[in-house]
């Protein structure tokens, strides 16, 4: 009887109200995904079934806060996700804070309070609000900001936060059943596409060009396997460059912006009108269901809109915390380096480059370099963030090494030695680093023409052989002019598709590469040869270029 009364009494007692921290709530969500018993979780955390259902319903908000939080300590202290009274002001202020942090500008507590007051006046709000120290503390706790001062705003790489974000990302991918085909990353890079390296000596012997400062910003995006590469988006200053007139198809997308940079409007338009349709088309191509989900991984930038704005049905975005971007952003793990390596080594003649190279050529070069990055580069770039995923090996390691490795040409030491042992000319006054810079840039040429020292000088070719060489060279020049005219003509005809134009431009690239194998690519070598002939007429230079002037008295001394 007594036991029944005790049981009835215990049953009638109300359970003490327990408010879990955000970290505990995220742990519950993770354990529910693993299939752990709800009853066991209720007993461990001393909560009811309705509480578990509420936590599960707010899982997306919890994970979003976790991803954007700068400090894991905020998860251990904060217990609710209540919104502030002035929600719009809070959102605008936090967005401003993220912009300044991404720019590397320190933001202190007083600065944040003054900016909040400024936004309050600009929005013409009437609801009373006191921007005090308590308000600042609540703002920091609400957004997971650990500390505010001039010394702590510069974000250093946080390895512990990187490990935690990797765990969050893996759980997110497992929850939605995502494969590497469904996970994308995007990032921007700037290109000063008309600028040349300063490799020639500044002694007045070489005609100088005014260095071009024409800049493009390129937005690159691809999935984790590298099998689907979104058409790059180039942003320039001009709305309709003269080089685009009459061209029906561009190999990449192009937008104009005053500073040649990505802004929120351009990025949002790219997301909804280029990225999302391209992803869905790719899913149809590989046989995935139309309702398959896709994730776009971004870093915090003033150019990117909020996560809530970058959503389209089954396609959504997540942001890397600022403190782990340098450690986990796939673009920083070799993709950007491989792209830039391919971009700065195009099969374009060095002579006449600044004046003949226009923005259309640069865009074609961007498309060529982006498509030439080996798929294995993309796959390896995700190893830090997603180490548990397995990829189907695509390109060989040799292909990746050829693309990414920056090594001096194998004949660099030999060439440099001959230059410095030769007659007194510009080559003897060059620094090793400047010569190596151009040798590395011309590394795609199989064998560089040897510069022969006076002791190795050879006799010039006979007049008949020279005439034959000049005739053959003229034929190559005529073919090059005709080929370029054909490409320009096809660009202005609507009957050619983008794929057909790409094939024609690829063939044009092969032709130009073969043409360059017949002549020195590096302008420095031409300068050395010309000066050697001018200062020492008895020296002849052995080269594959048949039209180089040469003294008929060479070797008669």
Swiss-Prot record:
GO terms for cellular component: cytoplasm; nucleus; ribonucleoprotein complex. GO terms for biological process: positive regulation of canonical Wnt signaling pathway. It is found in: Nucleus. Its main location: nucleus. The keyword Zinc-finger does not apply. Keywords: DNA-binding, Nucleus. InterPro entries: CenT-Element_Derived, DDE_SF_endonuclease_dom, Homeodomain-like_sf, HTH_CenpB_DNA-bd_dom, HTH_Psq. Pfam families: CENP-B_N, DDE_1, HTH_Tnp_Tc5. Residues 38-58, 110-142 bind DNA. Signal peptide: none annotated. Residues 77-149 form the HTH CENPB-type domain. One of its GO terms (molecular function) is mRNA binding. Residues 11-62 form the HTH psq-type domain. Residues 213-382 form the DDE-1 domain. PROSITE patterns: HTH_CENPB, HTH_PSQ. The keyword DNA-binding applies. Brain; highest in the temporal and brainstem regions. May bind DNA. Belongs to the tigger transposable element derived protein family. PANTHER family: JERKY PROTEIN HOMOLOG (PTHR19303:SF11), TRANSPOSON (PTHR19303). This is Jerky protein. It comes from Mus musculus. The gene is Jrk.
């Amino acid at each position: 009887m007594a036991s029944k009364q005790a049981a009835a009494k215990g049953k009638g007692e109300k359970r003490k109200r327990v408010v879990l921290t955000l970290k505990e709530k995220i742990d519950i969500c993770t354990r529910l995904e693993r299939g752990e018993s709800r009853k066991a979780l209720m007993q461990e955390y001393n909560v009811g079934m309705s509480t578990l259902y509420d936590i599960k319903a707010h899982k997306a908000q919890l994970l979003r806060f976790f991803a954007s939080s700068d400090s894991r300590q905020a998860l251990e202290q904060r217990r609710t996700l209540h919104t502030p009274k002035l929600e719009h002001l809070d959102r605008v202020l936090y967005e401003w804070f993220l912009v300044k942090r991404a720019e590397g500008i320190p933001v202190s507590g007083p600065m944040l309070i003054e900016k909040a007051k400024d936004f309050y006046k600009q929005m013409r709000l009437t609801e009373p609000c006191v921007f005090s120290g308590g308000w600042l503390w609540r703002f920091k706790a609400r957004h997971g900001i650990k500390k505010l001062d001039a010394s702590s705003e510069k974000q250093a790489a946080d390895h512990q936060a990187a490990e935690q974000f990797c765990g969050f990302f893996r759980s997110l991918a497992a929850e939605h059943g995502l494969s590497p085909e469904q996970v994308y990353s995007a990032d921007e890079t700037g290109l000063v596409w008309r600028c040349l390296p300063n490799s020639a000596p500044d002694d007045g012997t070489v005609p100088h060009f005014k260095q071009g400062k024409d800049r493009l910003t390129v937005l690159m995006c691809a999935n984790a396997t590298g099998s689907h590469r979104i058409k790059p988006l180039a942003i320039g200053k001009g709305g309709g460059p003269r080089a685009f007139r009459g061209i029906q198809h561009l190999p990449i997308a192009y937008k104009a912006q005053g500073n040649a940079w990505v802004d929120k409007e351009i990025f949002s338009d790219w997301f909804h009108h280029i990225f999302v349709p391209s992803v869905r088309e790719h899913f149809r191509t590989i046989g995935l269901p139309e309702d398959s989900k896709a994730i776009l991984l971004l870093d915090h930038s003033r150019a990117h809109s909020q996560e809530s704005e970058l959503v389209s049905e089954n396609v959504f975005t997540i942001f890397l915390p600022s403190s782990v971007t340098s450690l986990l952003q796939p673009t920083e793990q070799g993709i950007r380096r491989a792209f830039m390596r391919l971009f700065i080594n195009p099969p374009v003649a060095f002579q006449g480059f600044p004046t003949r190279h226009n923005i259309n050529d640069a865009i074609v070069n961007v498309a060529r370099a982006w498509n030439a990055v080996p798929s294995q580069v993309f796959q390896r770039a995700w190893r830090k963030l997603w180490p548990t995923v397995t990829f189907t090996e695509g390109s060989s390691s040799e292909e990746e090494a050829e693309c990414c490795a920056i090594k001096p040409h194998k004949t660099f030491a030999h060439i440099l030695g001959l230059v410095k042992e030769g007659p007194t000319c510009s080559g003897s006054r060059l620094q090793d680093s400047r010569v190596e810079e151009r040798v590395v840039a011309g590394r795609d040429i199989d064998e560089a023409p040897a510069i022969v020292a006076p002791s190795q000088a050879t006799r010039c070719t006979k007049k008949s052989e020279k005439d034959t060489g000049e005739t053959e060279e003229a034929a190559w020049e005529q073919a090059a002019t005709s080929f370029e005219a054909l490409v320009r003509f096809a660009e202005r005809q609507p009957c050619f598709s983008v794929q057909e134009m790409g094939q024609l431009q690829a063939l044009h690239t092969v032709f130009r590469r073969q043409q360059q194998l017949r002549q020195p690519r590096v302008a420095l070598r031409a300068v050395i040869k010309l000066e050697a002939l001018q200062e020492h007429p008895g020296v002849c230079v052995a080269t594959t270029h048949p039209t180089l002037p040469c003294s008929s008295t060479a070797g008669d001394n």
